[in-house]
Structure formats: structure tokens, C-alpha cells
Amino acid sequence: MFIHQTVRRNRSEFKINPHEEFRYFLIFAPLKQTFAMNYKEVIDNIYNEVKPFFGKGHVADYIPALANIDPKQYGIAIATLDGQIVGTGDYQTKFSIQSISKVFTLAMVVRHMGGDLWKYVGREPSGTPFNSLVQLEHEQGIPRNPFINAGALVVTDKLMNLYHRPKEAILQFVRSVAGNDDIYYDKTVAQSEFEHASRNQALGHFMKSFGNIDNDVDSLIDVYCNQCSIAMTCEDLAKSFLFLANHGINPHNNESILTVSRSKRLSALMLTCGFYDESGEFAFRVGMPGKSGVGGGVVAIIPGKLSIAVWSPELNEHGNSYMGIETLERFTTNIGISIF
């Protein structure tokens, strides 16, 4: 109430001592900077700074459909809660979102299961690669978190229990949060992934042996490969994560997707687990909850303000977009805002 009342007054109306003057500066100087931010100029400058980094990473080569992508593509898009959409570079080019889809399926399952989901998957960083089998045996088939492949398979398995037509439900959800009915599954990518899904098949069967997978493993892998193949642009992705920046409310239609509490917890998981064994480094360098995919996409949010999506197919040694990480580090540095 204090801030709302103060905003309506002229600063000259206040008779305040030097301590109050300093307090005024602390409260309103950052707000003024935020409201006046020219995001288009910011990302254009970052784009030009980062573009020379082409060639420092490599495309995902274990999925043929991804290995054949032109690596020299790079786009950035920002969507704000006050309705701004800005982009630069290849921000309107579609690409498969891969593991970014795990955020959508997690939101769908948490929406219906709530805390019951955590009986089947943990909430701790793994510190291991995204497709690792190592911890599962020690932890009795319970994956560390929902963003490594094993955890995402558990989430998709529960989603299959909730929806009679899970693939249709996932696509409908993504279209709704992105405000775009033209989003689709890339069947070529999905088929390519299914044909090279030996590790995910192993994860599924191993967890099923512990009783932590309910559905047929082949059917589970089919749904999972399709969700990873969803084709979106940077603009689509930025818009689709606004419901998390908006504390669980889809700003495109005012639908309540998650409670405020669940939205915060999902964002917390993105911060601690969203970048596999680089999650701590990302939090240290960037300071935003986010999620990456081996298709080269990265998306992150500043709660209450905006979401930003970056795409460049060349990956670093952790399987995250090399230029995407560089872009987001520069973004929070340049605007002077993160969650910390």
C-alpha cells in the first residue's frame, strides 16, 4: 500500500530527511530504470557481441535429425508481462525444443497431482549428465529431479495416467500457453529420436523394474520423443513461459494454470536443476530460473517481469547452447536485474 500511494505523488510533496531521501532513491531508481528499458536495443547489442562466437560449440550429433541442422543460426526474443514482444536474429525460425518440453509436462502433472508427484521423483540437483543411469540404482529407481531424462520420463508416465490422449493434451497445453495454435510436433525429429532412444529405453525399463513406471515403456518413449520434438520459435517460447513469470496465470487468457506456490516451486526447480550439471554455474553467472534443450534452445524468466528465449544449435560440453548461455549472462548484466 505504501508504494502505491507514493507512486501517485510528486516527489516534491515529500518533506523527508536525508535517510528518507536515500530510501526513496533505493525504491524508485530501479523501478524507473525497469520501466524505461529498451529491450530491443539491449538484445540487438548482445546479438552483435555474441555472434562472433559461432564455432565454439557443436550440434547434438547423437540424434541425426538434430545433427543436420545449420549450426550458424542464432535468435533472441523477449516477452514482457506488459505486452512487449521484441526479437532479433533468427527468432522466428522454428526448432525442436527438446528438454524445454519437460517444464510443460511438469506443469501439467503438478497441476493435477500436486505434492503426490514427489513420491516418484525428487527435487535435488543431480550433478550428472542429463541421461545418466548412475544414481538410479543407488536411489531405488527414484530420479533426482524432473529435468534429467529419468525424471522427465516419470513425469510423462504420470501424465499418460492422467490423459487418455496424452500427445494431444501436451500439444494443446503448449499452444495455449504460447498463444499460438500453429505449434506442432516435428514428426521427422520425433521418429529420429525414437530410433536412437536406447538410453531412454534403458532408463524406462530400469525404473519399471523398481515399480516407478506404470505404462508400457515403448509407449512412454513414443510420447516422450514427441514432446521433445515440438517445434517452436524463440518468440513462441518466450510467450509460453510468461505464465511462470506471471505466478501461474496464463496472461494470454487469464487462465490459472498453477497456484502461486506451485509456480514458485517450479521456478525454483528450474533454477537448481534446469541446466543439468551446469545448473549451479548458470545460477552463478545468470541468476534466472530457466531451462535448456539439446536443440539449442534456452528460456529463462524474471518473475513479475518477463521471459527471454534464445536459440543457437551449437552446444557446450554440458549439452547447453553455448551462445544461449553467453547471451543470458550478458542480458542480466546489462539490464542490472536478476532474481537476486
Features from the language model and the residues they span:
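A short, well-structured edge-of-sheet supersecondary motif
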Residues: 51-88, 299-300
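Short active-site loop at a secondary-structure junction
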Residues: 72-74, 87-108, 120-123, 143
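Active-site-proximal alpha-helical segments within enzyme catalytic domains
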Residues: 103, 107, 231-249, 302-313
